[in-house]
Amino acid sequence: QGGFMAMDVNTGRVLAMQGGFSFQHSSFNRATQARRQPGSSFKPFVYAAALDSGYSPATIVVDAPIEINTPQGVWRPQNASNQFYGPTPLRTGIEQSRNLMTIRLAQEVGMDIVAGYAERFGVYDRMSQVLSTALGSDETTLYQMVASYAMFANGGERVEPTLVDRVQDRYGQTIFRHDQRTCVDCDVALAAGEAPRITSNRERVMNEVTAFQLTSMMQGVVQRGTARSAINLPVPIAGKTGTTNDAKDVWFVGFSSNIVAGCYIGFDTPRTLGRGASGGGICGPVFNSFMSEAIQTYGGGAFRAPEDCQFISIDRFTGARLPDGVQGENVVTECFREGEEPIFGITFDGGFAMGSDVPLFRGGADETIKTIQKSDGTTATVGGQASAGALGSGGLY
């Protein structure tokens, strides 16, 4: 069984909803009623909290083993590949759905902050503040997930799904309207092809630069990450896959500039969907099929960049700033807040901007002391680089 839902990211209008394979077989609406673990499709909310807490898409976080003491014993989370990748830019963490980087981010930012984001967006009414929930172990509905992703797509403004746009009385007077934004010139005759100006008065739930940074990172999921083989559409698409433990539920939630849609598939009584089942492989094609048709009616375009964005070329493998105008497969143009542009080098979680002459890994005891430049422009003297197995200070873990 499964569920599907699509909505307009600006008005909240629900464009499509499917609650199961057959209403005759079951009238249970899995889009609105089934509470399931979202798995990795929850991770963008952890990254949103990190981006608003001083991280950038180029910040380096160490992907390495981690152990958490719990009342049930020691918890040792793993990446899906059962491998570790060392120092990695934040962008890659979400593109490749790295569990260990996400746990480390949640630990650094604080689960109270992450839970606050999830509750503000409406993913949960009350989220458990334990680290495992950063990987999507709390239950929610597809309806709530799609509505929450809509706020990424529209630049961070609150929007609620609706099945009713407006209600009129028998005289044609509007007595209820869902969209409360102000239309500046709706009563004025406009030239053909000219749209009225709509002024937003909605609550802002996320900084618009953060929303754009996150959207750009989630475009990478589709372009070269866990959804790359499933999504092939003529307009820019951002999204996130989700696969729970033992592939009992699989998800994909994604959006264009004007439509957000999500899919989850799983058994009503949870059991594995089979070896190799994944959100990208099962739900990705469902999303792609729907959006292929929807785009023909609703179109789509580039995601709007905020005026406060400062675009800088970054090496997507190392997170290092590159000279303007460089090109190549390793180059990605990142948005930075004004005044927070990175210096040349690699910005580590923990505050250091390490020049290209300082390797990420080096065998440790005999290394000479080095002077490095911190992210605020000042310098600091540090000892030799630790080995890969010993790297563990400065907030990296």
Predicted regions and their residues:
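Soluble non-cytosolic domains of exported or imported proteins
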Residues: 22, 35-41, 55, 84-88, ...
